[in-house]
């Protein structure tokens, strides 16, 4: 929530209503707790949109790194009963669909990223993935790329992916493959690559961060204009 404060504050300054969502984290809470929280948050925001002078139909989402993974699962499976278990009277009648999504250096293929971490000796990523999913069956099931590969009936909101090419956490093959699969499935996706930028590059002020911000603002403006 605080890591992308610089980026989100700049988006808010452009006139967008920004809500920063907390969700449960591993290892204390394994998958799908994180997606449950985000699913509830989008429904709560729709229920209370008028309080923020926002329209329920214009609410999108953004997520960075593992938050991008959580975002995409919530966006692609807005009505999945595994994710909609949290409820309250005020959210009844509101769905979990997203008008658009912005995924910042996201984990779009959790299983492929796990195999990459093992092969390259990234023990921290291996451990965090195991803590998150607990087993490889869950890793395959809770996998945005897997949803597309299995030809599941998925929601495909307009999507902007922001990815640095020097990201040691995310090999470029993953976002490139996902973008191709998303298009084939009928989704509208823009993959923007930032040469020599590392993981979480938008957390620091730079020309690349400025460019990413302008791309994000233009992307949202296009979605709200339709």
Question: Where do the model's predicted regions map?
Answer:
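Primarily recognizes the serine-hydrolase "nucleophile elbow" in alpha/beta-hydrolase
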Residues: 43-116
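Short beta-strand/loop motif that positions the catalytic acidic residue
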Residues: 155, 160-163, 167
